[in-house]
Curated annotation (Swiss-Prot):
Signal peptide residue numbers: none
Source species of the chain: Pseudomonas putida (strain ATCC 47054 / DSM 6125 / CFBP 8728 / NCIMB 11950 / KT2440)
Gene symbol of the encoding locus: mnmA
One Gene Ontology term, aspect cellular component: cytoplasm
Region Interaction with tRNA, residue ranges: 154-156, 316-317
GO molecular function: ATP binding; tRNA binding; tRNA-uridine 2-sulfurtransferase activity
Lineage: Bacteria, Pseudomonadati, Pseudomonadota, Gammaproteobacteria, Pseudomonadales
Top-level taxon: Bacteria
Protein name as annotated: tRNA-specific 2-thiouridylase MnmA
Length: 374
């Protein structure tokens, strides 16, 4: 199968997902310079935008429109709020109810940006879509591989690991070959309104609000005890859903008579007893795992795992590649690491790589401790 990207650019219509940020702005500009027929599309994925603390959807739309006006392309708008609620947000809440720490950006990419947006763009007559993600693609015969972005500080393949090769084949990633300072320099050179705009951080539907304040609107908090690894109760938590493995801030522990001055960290969430288990020190043994279990793994392209395979993995965004052996089990997958892994967190994603190729990944179900626990 010939990849759509191999067509003559002058005869190829590309719709760029315009977020109102500098990366998508420069992506559209670069595609114009490469000779593509370019249009933009701004997605609204969340309805509640009347509060000043919510992420600035109106400002983002205005910035996207200003950029499109500047470079001379049409901007479409689409509302995917219903799809986002059904396919991303409800799953996000269910995971927190189950005491896990989900990553909604990964589902958003799979269900919204590379499904709802892609389908909508194709219905408008597009041949391809494009986004401002820092990743690359490589066409190898009938398959299209997902590669890391060249800028190691901005590589976003971790967040795109659940997007299939067929969708990657329909997508261009113009800034994936660039480093962030180069992208900003291009935007400044061409007078784009987003040239100096700060990168968005956090989960879009939460914006600048405190996470705990947002979450309690949707889920009832269940306070419980905070215990040491020896079972001593040393405080109360407001709800396990507000805490994640390895967390240091916001525990409200201090001034204990027999404790050292070392900071406290979340080591474990005992869901059955609604207890938060904590310990002192950044290097506490309970923070480290030798292996993890993952349920279903989503592969970008088919992967043969008939026997254990040496790969690298990331258990969080921006982590350096960690050597591991991945094997099938009766109930899913098990990754055994060469080195101890800190704060492996159920609900987060583990993503596997073969060199620069992102193979895919899955949700972490459980971690196996590096050393035995009493």
């Amino acid at each position: 199968m010939t990849s759509p990207a191999l067509k003559d650019p002058a005869k190829t219509r590309v719709i760029v997902g315009m977020s109102g940020g500098v990366d998508s702005s420069v992506s559209a500009l670069l595609l114009i310079e490469q000779g593509y027929q370019v249009e933009g599309l701004f997605m609204k994925n969340w309805e509640e935008d009347d509060g000043t603390e919510y992420c600035t959807a109106r400002e983002d739309l205005a910035d996207a429109q200003a950029v499109c006006d500047r470079i001379g392309i049409k901007l479409h708008t689409a509302n995917f709020a219903a799809e986002y609620w059904d396919n991303v947000f409800e799953h996000f809440l269910e995971e927190y109810k189950a005491g896990r720490t989900p990553n909604p950006d990964i589902l958003c990419n799979r269900e919204i940006k590379f499904k709802a947006f892609l389908d909508y763009a194709l219905s408008l007559g597009a041949d391809l879509i494009a986004t401002g993600h820092y990743v690359r693609r490589r066409d190898t015969g009938a398959l299209t591989e997902l590669l890391k972005g060249l800028d190691p500080n901005k590589d976003q393949s971790y967040f795109l690991h659940a997007v299939g090769g067929q969708e990657i084949a329909r997508t261009l990633f113009p800034v994936g070959e660039l480093e962030k300072p180069e992208v900003r320099a291009i935007a400044e050179k061409h007078g784009l309104a987003t040239a100096k705009k700060k990168d968005s951080t956090g989960i879009c539907f939460i914006g600048e609000r405190r996470f705990s304040d947002f979450l309690k609107q949707y889920l009832p908090a269940q306070p419980g005890d905070i215990e040491t690894t020896e079972g001593e109760v040393i405080g109360r938590h407001h709800g396990l859903m507000y805490h994640t493995i390895g967390q240091r801030q916001g525990l409200g522990i201090g001034g204990l008579k027999d404790a050292s001055d070392e900071p406290w960290y979340v080591l474990h969430k005992d869901l059955a007893r609604n207890v938060l288990v904590v310990g002192q020190g950044n290097e506490h043994p309970w923070l480290f795992s030798r292996a993890l279990l993952a349920s279903e793994i989503f592969w970008v392209n088919p992967v043969d795992l008939g026997s254990p395979r040496q790969l690298t993995a990331k258990v969080r965004y921006r982590q350096s590649d960690q050597r591991c052996t991945l094997e099938r089990t009766a109930s899913g997958y098990r990754a055994v690491f060469d080195e101890p892994q800190r704060a492996v967190t159920p609900g987060q994603s583990v993503v596997f790589y073969d060199g620069e190729v992102c193979l895919g990944g899955g949700v972490i179900e459980a971690a196996e401790p590096w050393s035995p626990r009493a």
